[in-house]
């Protein structure tokens, strides 16, 4: 008889975050993300980063961001709504992080 559990070993979002954190510590974050995400999903993630960047920048309308990035306005709106739920400290941290990565 097998003693293999009938449930998934990874059931919480925090476990995924911890897995990514450990991969980063081992300088294998790129490998892990490529294993977890298809090329299309990586492109979608890139679009999401650009959406956050454009929303934080505040110089373009959601419609213009949609046209620039080739994503639906609803996707931009979801990103905007998520940002609205974040603290000012989180928004400042994100703005700083995005600015550092741009350089």
UniProtKB/Swiss-Prot annotation:
DNA-binding residues: 62-85
Keyword field contains Repressor: yes
Classification via InterPro entries: Trp_repress, Trp_repress_bac, Trp_repressor/repl_initiator, TrpR-like_sf
Keywords: Cytoplasm, DNA-binding, Repressor, Transcription, Transcription regulation
GO biological process: negative regulation of DNA-templated transcription
Family named by the database record: Belongs to the TrpR family.
Protein name: Trp operon repressor homolog
Name of encoding gene: trpR
């Amino acid at each position: 008889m097998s003693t293999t559990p009938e449930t998934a070993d990874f059931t919480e979002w925090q476990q995924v975050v911890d897995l990514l954190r450990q991969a980063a510590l081992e300088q294998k974050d790129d490998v892990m993300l490529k294993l977890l995400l298809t090329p299309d999903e990586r492109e979608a993630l890139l679009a999401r980063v650009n959406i956050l960047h454009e929303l934080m920048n505040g110089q373009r309308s959601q419609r213009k961001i949609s046209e620039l990035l080739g994503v639906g306005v609803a996707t931009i709106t979801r990103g905007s709504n998520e940002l609205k739920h974040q603290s000012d400290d989180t928004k400042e941290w994100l703005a700083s992080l995005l600015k550092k990565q741009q350089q």
